[in-house]
């Protein structure tokens, strides 16, 4: 009887560990490959939208949970703020940041592939729907 209980307990622990490891698993290699393949097209489209100050196109590239750096603005509100502050250089600053390019980053998210501008100002995430998003402003 004791052997059956030990075997049962061992199997239960193994199953729980397997479930836990898949629940907390990092990004899969297939996801990373898909992200790498789709990044250049997204980046070209995003960079063009930034250069043209195309708010409609940018809005489509931003998730509902866009992070504005801590001010609590939604994506459309943040873009409106950028437009309203154009004379203070808001668009110019974003354009310069984007012109420098991006690097892959694991600092901000282990759940999905992430890239950040080289000046560490803005970040991008490849979400579960297999699309890249301009996910937010890097907070202080």
Per-region residue spans from a language model:
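C-terminal-biased regions
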Residues: 28-48, 59-140
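Charged, alpha-helical scaffolding/interaction elements associated with membrane systems
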Residues: 51-52
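Hydrophobic helical h-region of N-terminal Sec-dependent signal peptides
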Residues: 12-18
